[in-house]
Amino acid sequence: MIRNFREHVDEIVVTDDCSGDGTATLARELGATVHSRPFRGYGDALRQGMEAASGDILVLVEADATFRAKDLGKLLEYLKDADMVIGTRTTRQMIEQGANMEGWLRWGNVAVAKLIEALWWGSEPRFTDVGCTYRAIWRDAYVKIRDYLTRDDAAFSPEMMIEMLRVEGRVIELPVRSYRRRRGVFKYSASRCKSLWTGFRILGVILRKRLNLS
């Protein structure tokens, strides 16, 4: 991932959960800034990474080569007219064989995304994916919502979307290529049972946000 992105960005921050597989050492050798500490989960790692980054534009990706820099240009182009641009992995023709976006998972993301559309209809959102990490956001926009980002798990991604809508930010969704993971497993969707449990937790977050309970 670092090799793929380093020619396209000014800085790469890797959040490393004190892993013992040499991730931090390799990342530093490739020129990344490594932020090592025990994280409480996926959302906490992303949040700490954004806090550690210094740029005016923050780009989030996973470290397992699921996404490529070839899609970064269009995210940044659309960001000129938005507060945040998020990717969607639901375009079938852009999903590599073996990628973790089986039909049931893809349609589950679509269904939950449409629920957010319905509940925040006045903001005119157009979403088809609530779980795509690949996104770009202006630092100023992130600062507006960071105090409301409380989730440490996979619900962090839809929470970002919802909080941008709540501050009347403009969010644009674009299709991005989704590739097979080169290593590791995303624990929140490692099996159908875990995906369903993650989905229910995300639904709970959405409803609490809509009812202003969090």
Predicted features along the sequence, with ranges:
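Short, well-formed alpha-helical segments that are part of the catalytic scaffolds
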Residues: 1-7
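Conserved donor nucleotide-binding strand/loop of the catalytic core
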Residues: 10-13, 24-52
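A conserved acidic beta->alpha catalytic loop
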Residues: 16-24, 65
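Acidic donor-diphosphate engagement hotspot in glycosyltransferases and nucleotidyltransferases
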Residues: 23, 70-72, 160
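Acceptor/aglycone-binding surface of glycosyltransferases and processive sugar-polymer synthases
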Residues: 37-40, 44-51, 69-150, 154, ...
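Short aromatic/hydrophobic "clamp" motif used to bind/position activated sugar donors
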Residues: 58
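Catalytic metal- and UDP-sugar-binding loop of GT-A-like glycosyltransferases, i.e.
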Residues: 61-63
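Catalytic donor-sugar/metal-binding loop of nucleotide-sugar-dependent glycosyltransferases
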Residues: 150-152, 161-179
